[in-house]
Amino acid sequence: METKVIAINRRSANITEGKSRAPNRSMYYAMGYEESDFKKPMIGVANGHSTITPCNSGLQKLADAAIDAIEEAGGNAQVFGTPTISDGMAMGTEGMKYSLVSREVISDCIETCVQGQWMDGVLVVGGCDKNMPGGLMGMLRANVPAIFVYGGTILPGHYQGKDLNIVSVFEAVGENAAGRMSDEDLLQIERRAIPGTGSCGGMYTANTMSSAFEALGISLPYSSTMANPHDEKLNSAKESARVLIEAVKKDIKPRDIVTKKSIENAVAVIMATGGSTNAVLHFLAIAHAAGVEWTIDDFERVRQKTPVLCNLKPSGQYLAVDLHQAGGIPQVMKMLLVAGLLHGDCITISGQTIAEVLADVPDAPRAGQDVIRPIDQPMYAQGHLAILKGNLSPEGCVAKITGLKNPVMTGPARVFEDEQSGLKAILDGKIVAGDVMVLRYLGPKGGPGMPEMLAPTGALIGAGLGESVGLITDGRFSGGTWGMVVGHVAPEAAAGGNIAFIEEGDSITIDANQLLLQLNISDAELESRKVGWTAPAPRYTRGVQAKFAFNASSASKGAVLDDY
């Protein structure tokens, strides 16, 4: 990509230059600006710091470091806030329905502030799951030079010689309910699982999306697997600010970086690292914001040619900090590049291509570690996020299929209209091996907000039923989920999807080998059940949930709000 040097304040000049803008400049003077500052670029800092969650409570120091570096590099830092929801805290409650909504609110905040204030560039600092897709969607809509600074991963907790993370606690609840763990051990795991700041430590949603941002080239190399408490994270934030100022000078914008080829790169890295099912939903939305043609079937295309190289939780053994020590995302990317599974000509925020960024990275992982496998000895020959279709999900749904002893099951439906009743049935011992749980009316419109469900899946794992009980839903799963689970079923129940017409005891087949999700009744029987069906009344009639339910597209299109 050829870059050209431009006036670095060309956007902000709209509100700072000329006699008619004297009132505007007066307001800047009130904040300590000098006349010379108006020739400098106005750089937004979208600060996701919050004391709501440890994922974001360590962000202020990164924002401060970036602000200082922006000023030192000749820019004016303009700080504004973006909200967050703690998925880990909201999980299993009505609050979880606000998680996906927050993705849209974050993107709206960034687009609104950047465009409303004529900013010349923006640096986004985020931590918890929806901060990443929401941040990038806002960056793409505004389409000014931009970079994402990830808050960093959390360090592991420890108990009885084992590493712990937030998923350990959810699974411990299930073990305790099944009589396999004492109350004292549950309490100790609860207290020790999260020792400090940073995002949840496995290849869960936050680390999945931040790793994908490295692969896109919208974040700096190695930044996604750094731990929040470590000094290198501060240094990375400073370097991100310096790189952004250069991108403003060269006019490198998000839509130059986020293309179909770079999304393929990101999805290849998601597959290679064993990332979260949520990445499917979020990259459909990111592609929409970028104006890139990308469908749910493209994930399956990339999956079939990309091996799983990393032995990472939830279905593997290690955490993001271990991946960092083993060479980080650049090592994984270099292996994929050498194997012809990555596009090396994609541009990054630094102005370098992916191939140039990876030039000095070894072709193969170092010996003596088991986090990153050699390309010819992968964890699995194909990716783990499979797109299933069938009469229960003609638009597609997402299953995490690696690590399962038997990726095929047929069993009787156990139908629940909400998450809480399904969780109670598990904890009360009413779900048995061979059952297929159906949790419905939890999609983008029906939830509304398409809540994640780590509590039921964690309870199944803890009860020893993770591979013997199936669970399908039009809602989502946490990045920490594993087992025989299928989410994002589309069309959703609230839109009249066939998941709405499953009856208790119906036979359901989940077949990851054949990429099939099937309700085993005749077409005639299925059609007869639809007679007289009407959509349920909205659960919310005012506020953000009502707006989300009214506007949200299908999960197969990313559950976006502007698919008009």
Swiss-Prot record:
Residues annotated as carrying N6-carboxylysine in the record are: K130
PROSITE patterns assigned to the protein according to its UniProt record, in alphabetical order: ILVD_EDD_1 (PS00886), ILVD_EDD_2 (PS00887)
Please provide the record's keywords in A-Z order. 2Fe-2S, Amino-acid biosynthesis, Branched-chain amino acid biosynthesis, Iron, Iron-sulfur, Lyase, Magnesium, Metal-binding
Give the E.C. number(s). Answer: 4.2.1.9
Single GO BP term: isoleucine biosynthetic process
Note accompanying the cofactor annotation: Binds 1 [2Fe-2S] cluster per subunit. This cluster acts as a Lewis acid cofactor.
State whether keyword Nucleotide-binding applies: no
Cofactor(s) required, per the database record:
[2Fe-2S] cluster; Mg(2+)
Reaction(s) catalysed (UniProt annotation)? (2R)-2,3-dihydroxy-3-methylbutanoate = 3-methyl-2-oxobutanoate + H2O; (2R,3R)-2,3-dihydroxy-3-methylpentanoate = (S)-3-methyl-2-oxopentanoate + H2O
Biological function = Functions in the biosynthesis of branched-chain amino acids. Catalyzes the dehydration of (2R,3R)-2,3-dihydroxy-3-methylpentanoate (2,3-dihydroxy-3-methylvalerate) into 2-oxo-3-methylpentanoate (2-oxo-3-methylvalerate) and of (2R)-2,3-dihydroxy-3-methylbutanoate (2,3-dihydroxyisovalerate) into 2-oxo-3-methylbutanoate (2-oxoisovalerate), the penultimate precursor to L-isoleucine and L-valine, respectively.
Which PANTHER family does the record cross-reference, listed alphabetically?
DIHYDROXY-ACID DEHYDRATASE DAD, DIHYDROXY-ACID DEHYDRATASE, MITOCHONDRIAL
Describe its partners and assembly state: Homodimer.
Query: What NCBIfam families does the record tag this protein with?
Result: ilvD, PRK00911.1
Q: What is this protein called?
A: Dihydroxy-acid dehydratase
Q: Which organism was this protein described from?
A: Polaromonas naphthalenivorans (strain CJ2)
Q: Which gene encodes it?
A: ilvD
